[in-house]
């Protein structure tokens, strides 16, 4: 059967939102670890 274009667009938008959320989360984590006082050995 043919997949409707609307379904593909909806899936693409959902994936895009998920990737953006992951990017924001990893960036926030990087910033947090950068500013967190490091334990000196």
Curated annotation (Swiss-Prot):
Induction: By bacterial infection.
Cross-referenced InterPro entries: Moricin_fam (IPR009456), Moricin_sf (IPR037043)
Source taxon at top rank: Eukaryota
Short name of one Pfam family: Moricin
GO BP annotations, alphabetical order: defense response to bacterium; innate immune response
Keyword terms, alphabetized: Amidation, Antibiotic, Antimicrobial, Immunity, Innate immunity, Secreted
Residues annotated as signal peptide: none
PTM annotation (Histidine amide): residues: 41
Distribution of this protein across tissues and organs: Hemolymph.
Nuclease recorded as keyword: no
Gene3D superfamilies with a match to the protein in the record: Moricin domain
Compartments in which it is found: Secreted
The keyword Secreted belongs to this UniProt entry's keyword annotation: yes
Cellular component terms per the entry's GO annotation: extracellular region
Assembly, per entry: Monomer.
Function: Has antibacterial activity against Gram-positive and Gram-negative bacteria.
Family statement: Belongs to the moricin family.
Name of protein: Virescein
Source organism of the structure: Heliothis virescens (Tobacco budworm moth)
């Amino acid at each position: 059967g043919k997949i409707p274009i609307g379904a593909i667009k909806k899936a693409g938008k959902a994936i895009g939102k998920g990737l953006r959320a992951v990017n924001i989360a990893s960036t926030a984590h990087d910033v947090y670890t950068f500013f967190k006082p490091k334990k000196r050995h």
